[in-house]
């Protein structure tokens, strides 16, 4: 897994910090799809993950948290700080996603969350299914991760 001066192992405290400071689009998405308050939803995502990371800005401020479950479900939730350093955030996100040792990654995103839809496109995820859940318009996305190390037994 890629680590850098902007990507760190996540802790429950990091998850709560981001949960209390989510972008409004991320907050709406998780509260409407998970039925939990934002901090609780972020903490649940953290505890359900096989791995999780904490992204920071060049100024050390929280940008977001992300993780992957044992079922290959990738997730990311962000603060507004990422909007202040978009190139750094996209570059580091790409490095992290491309370093993951999973055969594929998938999840869904609220179609109204334009920043994350754009980020997913930049990270080369493919959109494969549109549906509505709890009144939320969602898009399923997937990315095959052709990592040769996974083929060795």
Model-derived segments and spans:
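Conserved beta-strand-loop-alpha-helix junction that forms the acyl-donor binding cleft
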Residues: 105-121, 131-135
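Conserved GNAT-fold acetyl-CoA-binding loop/helix
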Residues: 24-42
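A short beta-loop-alpha structural element at the N-terminal edge
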Residues: 1-22
């Amino acid at each position: 897994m890629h680590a850098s001066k902007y990507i760190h192992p996540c802790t429950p405290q990091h998850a709560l910090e981001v949960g209390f400071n989510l972008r409004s689009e991320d907050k709406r998405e998780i509260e409407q799809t998970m039925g939990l308050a934002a901090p609780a939803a972020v903490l649940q995502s953290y505890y359900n993950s096989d791995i999780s990371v904490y992204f920071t800005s060049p100024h050390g401020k929280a940008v977001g948290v992300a993780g992957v479950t044992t079922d290959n479900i990738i997730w990311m939730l962000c603060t507004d700080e990422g909007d202040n350093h978009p190139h750094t955030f996209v570059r580091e996100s790409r490095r992290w996603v491309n370093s993951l040792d999973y055969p594929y990654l998938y999840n869904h995103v609220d179609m109204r969350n334009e920043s994350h839809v754009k980020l997913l496109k930049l990270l080369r995820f493919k959109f494969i299914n549109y549906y509505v859940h709890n009144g939320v318009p969602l898009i399923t996305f997937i990315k095959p991760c052709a990592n040769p190390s996974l083929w060795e037994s």
